[in-house]
């Protein structure tokens, strides 16, 4: 038998695939939750890009922009019933707070911080005042999985390493925007230095063992 070829689908997976067969047992409510989970990453990517554009161009978000954001999600392929099922009001408020604070603090969005090919990362929003010796890093979370401040400590350490500014030479504030709340942390120089030491030590270990191979 000559089977039909679906070249455009090769290497891709259906939203409800055979390998994730548990959807066979779903009722409509469970199916809706499953689909919301399936689209969560895509929604996060879209919202991050909206935030990036607004912070970059210094255009604040207002409550009346909620429908515009919803329209962007729809235009990017997110089903309307998924948007209705998630806490979109809370999600938009969280996005608005993150964007407007980023603009207020004159931050730069999506900045890559690099130490080596083994250690680099992208800060959602970052600003550094050479006058005040103050580092500010904000992270935006669109999902509900509990965030950890360690991620931002790594960014602070990467900043220190890339720009050769010792942790004791600057103060910092780290923020995570998630589920309508803001987690604040003012790390000590010792906290950041501990991460710096770990990064440099692990980088040497990786490079040494890679060279041996």
Predicted features, each with a name:
Residues 1-89, 107-111:
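Nuclease catalytic cores
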Residues 52-56, 101, 213:
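N-terminal interaction/assembly modules
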Residues 54, 95-99, 159-163, 206:
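Hydrophobic, Leu/Ile/Phe/Ala-enriched alpha-helical segments that form helix-helix packing faces
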Residues 91-94, 198, 205:
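Charge-rich, solvent-exposed alpha-helical interaction surfaces
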Residues 204-213:
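Accessory terminal regions of nucleic-acid processing enzymes
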